[in-house]
Amino acid sequence: MSNIYDSANELSRGLRGLPEYKAVKAAKDAIAADAEASKIFTDYLAFQEEIQKLAQTGQMPDASFQAKMEGFGKQIQGNSLLSEFFTKQQQLAIYLSDIEKIVFEPVSELLK
């Protein structure tokens, strides 16, 4: 029987070899090469982190957060590099969701 960590590392390498992973990486590299897209992306990630911190402390985002999220949505949709990145990321997320189901299946069985 192989070491479970070896299997996890093999899975990691397999993910990096997927065309969808490579497409997300290429899209992210394109964002990094464009000052406007990079700024929006960095600001968006900081905003997401801020929302996560609120959620972790049990606080609810107020109306200003909703307005800010809508603003980011418009900026992302209006920038072809960013919209391409998020589209490619969603395609990769399908694999990650499937893998998550497979990995957590034994744990789910324990709870039944």
UniProtKB/Swiss-Prot annotation:
Q: List the disulfide bonds.
A: none
The family database entries (Pfam families) matched by this protein are listed as: Com_YlbF
Q: Which InterPro entries match?
A: Com_YlbF, YheA/YmcA-like_dom_sf
Q: Which Gene3D superfamilies match?
A: YheA/YmcA-like
Its domain of life reads Bacteria
Family per record? Belongs to the UPF0342 family.
Q: What is this protein called?
A: UPF0342 protein SP_1372
Tell me which species this is from. Answer: Streptococcus pneumoniae serotype 4 (strain ATCC BAA-334 / TIGR4)
